[in-house]
């Protein structure tokens, strides 16, 4: 009989982070297929088994060992007080590549200006424990109630204030709310069960996954440029290349020419390529980068 197959159980966030997470994994080289209404994506890696679950519950189930590894926010690790290994910071969110913020917000017309003004007030939020800790640190007594969603619509009739997550602030502004204070900045993290982390095979698999995911994040907004350059114009051409590092220079069969290769910010390409061409570069082409590993 053959030895049993090694398997790593992966928890993926269901909901607002799902699409951006699956896109990130695809760039890292892991391609999932999710059927309609299914919570069990298929993947092109027979050593992985994935389940979609709400990010709010992820840290709890990773701690229990239901998953070897999962993705969730720092906020939910703190909120659930989960004992997990924080393997890697993955700074991306549903709409951008930046952290989200949990903020104290009130109606624009509210007299509340600081956390001290919350004494005796009602606050609605999904992160009850984070909010209670924040109030305790500021010596404020207020009633904190769990919000099942649509938190922005609750003030002023159903709550005096809310603690809500925001990425751009647009939803708060649309509901005529203003931010009083920021409680917490949060980003997605790759987390692991402690027993799984102590298993050599699983740890290597998790570390490889973290490396590839980080590489995919670092490659966001970057492209590669290749070109041929006459040696007598090399210094002039190099002056126009705003690369992450010094370009790679390779000799060509014609000893009067060299090949250059460099990684640049994609937003600079529209101005850089014309400058390179005018400086004497030829055969310039741009290519997409999925991963950038330092």
Swiss-Prot record:
Q: In which pathway does it act?
A: Amino-acid biosynthesis; L-histidine biosynthesis; L-histidine from 5-phospho-alpha-D-ribose 1-diphosphate: step 1/9
Principal cellular location given in the protein's record? cytoplasm
EC nos? 2.4.2.17
Biological process, per Gene Ontology: L-histidine biosynthetic process
Keyword flag Glycosyltransferase = yes
One Pfam family, short name please? HisG
Q: What class of enzyme is it?
A: transferase
Quote the record's activity regulation. Answer: Feedback inhibited by histidine.
Q: What's in the keyword line of the UniProt record?
A: Amino-acid biosynthesis, ATP-binding, Cytoplasm, Glycosyltransferase, Histidine biosynthesis, Magnesium, Metal-binding, Nucleotide-binding, Transferase
Question: Mind listing the GO molecular function terms for this protein?
Answer: ATP binding; ATP phosphoribosyltransferase activity; magnesium ion binding
Subcellular localization: Cytoplasm
Show the GO cellular component annotation of the record: cytoplasm
Q: Which cofactor does it need?
A: Mg(2+)
Reactions that this protein is recorded to catalyse: 1-(5-phospho-beta-D-ribosyl)-ATP + diphosphate = 5-phospho-alpha-D-ribose 1-diphosphate + ATP
NCBIfam families, sorted: hisG (TIGR00070), HisG_C-term (TIGR03455)
Give the protein family: Belongs to the ATP phosphoribosyltransferase family. Long subfamily.
What this chain does, per the entry, is described as: Catalyzes the condensation of ATP and 5-phosphoribose 1-diphosphate to form N'-(5'-phosphoribosyl)-ATP (PR-ATP). Has a crucial role in the pathway because the rate of histidine biosynthesis seems to be controlled primarily by regulation of HisG enzymatic activity.
Q: What is this protein called?
A: ATP phosphoribosyltransferase
Organism whose genome encodes this protein: Prosthecochloris aestuarii (strain DSM 271 / SK 413)
Q: Which gene encodes it?
A: hisG
């Amino acid at each position: 009989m053959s030895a049993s197959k090694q398997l790593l159980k992966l928890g993926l966030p269901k909901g607002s982070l799902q699409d951006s997470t699956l896109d990130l994994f695809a760039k890292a080289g892991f391609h999932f297929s999710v059927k309609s209404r299914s919570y069990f994506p298929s993947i092109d890696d027979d050593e992985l088994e994935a389940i979609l679950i709400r990010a709010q519950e992820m840290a709890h189930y990773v701690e229990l060992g239901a998953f070897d590894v999962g993705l969730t926010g720092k906020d939910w690790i703190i909120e659930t007080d989960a004992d997990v290994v924080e393997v890697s910071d993955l700074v991306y969110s549903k709409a951008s590549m930046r952290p989200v913020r949990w903020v104290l917000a009130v109606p624009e017309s509210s007299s509340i200006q600081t956390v001290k003004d919350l004494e005796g007030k009602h606050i609605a939020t999904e992160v009850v424990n984070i909010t209670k800790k924040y109030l305790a640190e500021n010596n404020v007594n207020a009633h904190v109630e769990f919000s099942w969603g649509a938190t922005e619509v609750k003030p002023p009739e159903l709550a005096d204030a809310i603690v809500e997550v925001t990425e751009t602030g647009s939803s708060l502004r649309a509901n005529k709310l203003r931010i009083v204070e920021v409680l917490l900045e949060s980003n997605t993290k790759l987390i692991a069960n402690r027993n799984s982390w102590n298993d050599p095979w699983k740890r290597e698999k998790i570390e490889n996954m973290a490396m590839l995911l980080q590489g995919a994040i670092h490659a966001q907004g970057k492209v590669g440029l290749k070109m041929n350059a006459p040696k007598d114009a090399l210094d002039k051409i190099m002056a126009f290349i705003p690369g992450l590092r010094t370009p790679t220079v390779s000799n060509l069969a014609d000893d009067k020419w060299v090949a250059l290769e460099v990684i640049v910010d994609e937003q600079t390409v529209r101005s850089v390529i014309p400058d390179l061409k005018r400086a004497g570069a030829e055969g310039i082409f741009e290519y997409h980068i999925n991963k950038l590993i330092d």
